[in-house]
Amino acid sequence: MKKISSVFTMFALIAAILFSGFIPQQAYAETTLTPTATNKTASIQLTSDVHTLAVINTFDGVADYLIRYKRLPDNYITKSQASALGWVASKGNLAEVAPGKSIGGDVFSNREGRLPSASGRTWREADINYVSGFRNADRLVYSSDWLIYKTTDHYATFTRIR
């Protein structure tokens, strides 16, 4: 009789879970992990920003994200944030101290004037196609009024993509 009671209890529990609408993946999909820097140690901050779960680091992916959300994806951190985590550019250790992260969001000065200027316009840059080791020459440069350019030769030439 005890065995039948246990089987019935297990069946009731499974039925309750199935009919409650609980889907474990929903709980995961609503949680985004966002690293934040605190004195060379990384901590995790939970947010409900579903669209930033994936690493986005291609020209089109980042450009589309910028246009849609008016900010870089969460896998981007500034040079100062990376430095706080222990990044040293000359060591090429970003992937070691901030796995899955790319450098982006710092001001691009446009000193050579290769990009169009306008009153009040500022430019920012983001590394593209970074996986590990030393940063490459691919950059996306975007303006405060959402002009977006790419360079594959470390700022020698630019092509407007948005």
UniProtKB/Swiss-Prot annotation:
Coiled coil: none annotated. Its main location: secreted. Keywords: Endonuclease, Hydrolase, Nuclease, Secreted, Signal. The keyword Phosphoprotein does not apply. Residues 1-29 form the signal peptide. Pfam families: Ribonuclease. GO terms for molecular function: RNA binding; RNA endonuclease activity. The active site is at E125, H154. The keyword Mitochondrion does not apply. It comes from the Bacteria. Its EC number is 3.1.27.-. It is found in: Secreted. This is a purine-specific ribonuclease. Belongs to the ribonuclease N1/T1 family. This is Ribonuclease.
